[in-house]
């Protein structure tokens, strides 16, 4: 602990935030790179619907057909459209999420250090809302870059900064926050995923007779995949609505198709029914499940690594405090011994003065 006047600066919280942010960003970047082609396909399915059916007429070839179309029309580079803003967005995304999530859990936990499911959901939702507001512009850019290759008559963005500049110039700040309402509605996803993930980890730790911090990577992978599937299925429709709203401003001088969230939901439901709200869900699960496994497993392992590399400041503070207490104790003991010695010497001198000398042989 570092003291400044009456205020106390908790270095441990800074260390934990840095460790969480570093581990999360590393894990997210690895996962994003691995599953980017599926992310491109999912985004295009959400915005444009199904690709042209293969000539063979076989069913179940949506992903393969989409990949072939992308490679044929845009090359292998097309499979990684939007990767740069995705990775750039993940850095503040995880930094904001885990720092806010950790702080809210500390605030909401009971006096005995336990966190109820309801409090965990509130913490996860609050962190999700803060993250959505902070990073929405980057996700808008990512969506535009992923879909621009298949929009006729669209002047393509040259880079991430080019996309930012043009969106601000042509649509204003509002364009960077298109789709923010369904994004905020999407906090229900993390409000389900994170509490479920932690409960599953606790169950597995209990079954293995170990602590949550010492779970094996395999158990972490299982817990993260189950939690992700549950949350994705329950909350997927908001992703479709968000993608449609984020993408529609890209076509110049085109009539706005959706006036808002409610209008978008109504039109999608009328034209496509419930399946329209789950368009791309299977692809999304194929993308998000391994992504969650990679992200959470890497995150947990990197977090343990960072905690080992950077020992808790509180431990060093405790060591210094114990050393100071030991020195003070030794000093006090020395002072007490000096006082005792002085007292004994004074008593000896007093005895010598007060005791008369009686010569031997006197009567």
Curated annotation (Swiss-Prot):
One of its GO terms (cellular component) is mitochondrial membrane. Disulfide bonds: none annotated. Inhibited by pyridoxal 5'-phosphate, bathophenanthroline, tannic acid, mersalyl, mercuric chloride, p-hydroxymercuribenzoate, p-hydroxymercuribenzoate sulfonate, bromocresol purple and N-ethylmaleimide. Residues 313-363 are annotated as: Disordered. Keywords: Antiport, Membrane, Mitochondrion, Repeat, Transmembrane, Transmembrane helix, Transport. It is a multi-pass membrane protein. Residues 315-343 have a biased composition (Basic and acidic residues). SUPFAM superfamilies: Mitochondrial carrier. Signal peptide: none annotated. It holds the Pfam family Mito_carr. Residues 345-354 have a biased composition (Polar residues). The chain crosses the membrane at residues 21-41, 82-102, 121-141, 176-196, 215-235, 277-299. It is found in: Mitochondrion membrane. Its main location: mitochondrion. One of its GO terms (molecular function) is antiporter activity. Highly expressed in young meristematic shoot area, vascular bundles of leaves, developing siliques including the funiculi, petal veins, developing pollen and central cylinder of roots. GO terms for biological process: NAD transport. Solcar repeats lie at residues 15-107, 115-203, 215-305. Mediates the NAD(+) import into chloroplast. Favors the NAD(+)(in)/ADP or AMP(out) antiport exchange, but is also able to catalyze a low unidirectional transport (uniport) of NAD(+). Appears to be a mitochondrial envelope-located membrane protein lacking an N-terminal-located transit peptide. Belongs to the mitochondrial carrier (TC 2.A.29) family. This is Nicotinamide adenine dinucleotide transporter 2, mitochondrial. The gene is NDT2.
